[in-house]
Swiss-Prot record:
Gene name linked to the record: serS
EC number: 6.1.1.11
The entry's keywords: Aminoacyl-tRNA synthetase, ATP-binding, Cytoplasm, Ligase, Nucleotide-binding, Protein biosynthesis
Biological-process GO terms, alphabetical: selenocysteine biosynthetic process; seryl-tRNA aminoacylation
Subunit structure: Homodimer. The tRNA molecule binds across the dimer.
Predominant location: cytoplasm
UniProt name for this protein: Serine--tRNA ligase
Species of the source: Thermomicrobium roseum (strain ATCC 27502 / DSM 5159 / P-2)
Function: Catalyzes the attachment of serine to tRNA(Ser). Is also able to aminoacylate tRNA(Sec) with serine, to form the misacylated tRNA L-seryl-tRNA(Sec), which will be further converted into selenocysteinyl-tRNA(Sec).
The keyword Cell membrane is annotated on this UniProt entry: no
Single GO MF descriptor: serine-tRNA ligase activity
Length: 445
């Protein structure tokens, strides 16, 4: 949420920023309501002062017509104040609702552009691996090795759901555990395990509501919402709190499933697991002092890059232009990894600085020092990293001529030393193998 004073005192600046974002917001109505609200506040305060003065005067008047007239005037004042209070409450409610519709403003150094075509590639790391055999996309590898059961995922839950099988399910677990350990042990984050269902207030705090309700899963009976990212519950840990002096920065990391309706054009990304309704993600969230948030954004990007470098996956860092910024971000960098099978760059991390936009919505403040006036924190978040796209990148970059998939070296300790993923057994084969072993042991005895 923007500071109302910024809109009031610099409306042209806000309008110009919205123009760069290629979006609109109800600024005129906000300004009109703000002016009326200020008039009402002044009028109510004046009437209350008048009522207090008349109340003291009544105590000094003897019984008689003048006293009765003053009492009647007092009642009229009370009725007027009550009516104005009702109007003021309605205006404040409407004003708050309108302010929630205004996006964050881009930082001055964000490239200006109409859409993703205006994004700027900041740097590359690594070279795409040369292959001397035909490279397959991840969905072909998955089908040939029995790693993903697409048909049964659809049968269970509908389109864009899937079932990971065997070593790929294990690789996902290993990847999540390794990323969490890296962020905790080397990057200075504290792991948290938050709820996957949140209240409406939490979604409003991070900017997901009211604008993006159509993309969220919602239980109407309880008014609980399935999280689209761990950013929502983790950011709201400190909603309506004042953090004590010396408590910033705070670095938190969480691994959660994410749920999104992901309404996309028919025929787009229909193969594989690139765009799905349920996926896992490791999320980094920061609460920092305002004068440190620029530096902290660069550190956040570096933490996400470290994951990709250790996985030895070629990637690029892309700065979002004004036309491709999210609703809540003042500045955002995406990390895109190269997928040689599908011949495309896949976004596996978005790292954003929200400034005080989320903190105002969620009322998250801190005291710079003892006795100091509370200020809004700055919040940041970034994927570190998102699955299944990181799985896609591993499958396609580490595929071998014999059709197997090499396991990245950093993940092998989390896979019991396993080095490659091959053809997976049928659903019933592990149980049959156990039975055969038990029968063999029984025969030996």
């Amino acid at each position: 949420m923007l500071d109302l004073r910024l809109i009031r005192e610099h409306p042209d600046l806000v309008r110009e920023a919205l123009r760069k974002l290629n979006t609109e917001a109800p600024l005129d109505e906000i300004l009109e309501l703000d002016e009326r609200r200020r008039q009402l506040v002044a009028e109510v305060e004046q009437l209350k002062a008048q009522r207090n003065a008349e109340s003291k005067r009544i105590g000094q008047l003897p019984a008689g017509p003048e006293r009765e007239a003053t009492i009647a005037a007092m009642r009229a004042l009370g009725d007027r104040i009550e009516a104005l209070d009702r109007e003021l409450a309605a205006i404040e409610e409407r004003l708050q609702a309108l302010l929630l519709e205004v996006p964050n403003l881009p930082d001055p150094d964000v490239p200006v552009g109409p859409d993703e075509s205006g994004n700027v590639v900041v740097r590359h790391w690594g070279e795409p691996r040369p292959f001397d055999f035909p490279v397959k996309p991840h969905w072909e590898l998955a089908e040939e090795l029995g790693l993903i059961d697409f048909a049964r995922g659809v049968k269970i839950a509908g389109s864009r759901f899937y079932v990971l099988r065997g070593d790929l399910a294990r690789l996902q677990r290993a990847l999540i555990a390794w990323m969490i350990d890296l962020h905790v042990n080397e990057h200075g984050y504290l792991e948290v395990y938050p709820p996957f269902l949140v209240r409406r207030e939490a979604m409003i705090g991070t900017g997901n509501l009211p604008k993006f309700g159509d993309n969220l899963y919602h239980d109407e009976e309880t008014d609980l919402w399935l999280i689209p990212t761990a950013e929502v519950p983790v950011t709201n840990l400190f909603r309506d709190e004042i953090l004590p002096p010396g408590s910033l920065p705070i670095y938190l990391v969480a691994a959660t499933p994410c749920f999104r309706k992901e309404r996309v054009s028919a025929g787009r990304d229909v193969r594989g697991i690139k765009r799905v309704h349920q996926f896992e993600k490791v999320e980094m969230v920061k609460f920092v002092e305002p004068d440190r948030s620029d530096e902290e954004l660069q550190r956040l990007v570096a933490d996400a890059e470290d994951v990709l470098r250790r996985l030895e996956l070629p990637y690029r860092v892309v700065q979002m232009c004004t036309g491709d910024l999210s609703f809540t971000a003042a500045k955002k960098f995406d990390l895109e990894v190269w997928a040689p099978g599908s011949q495309e760059w896949l976004e596996v991390s978005s790292c954003s600085n929200f400034r005080d936009f989320q903190a105002r919505r969620a009322n998250i403040r801190y005291r710079p020092s003892e006795g100091a006036r509370p200020q809004f924190v700055h919040t940041l978040n970034g994927s570190g990293l998102a699955l299944p796209r990181t799985l896609i990148a591993i499958m396609e970059n580490y595929q071998q001529p014999d059709g197997t998939i090499e396991i990245p070296a950093v993940l092998r300790p989390y896979m019991g030393g396993q080095q490659r993923i091959g053809r997976q057994p049928a659903y019933w084969e592990p149980a049959q193998a156990r039975r055969a072993r038990e029968q063999a042991r029984a025969g030996d005895s």
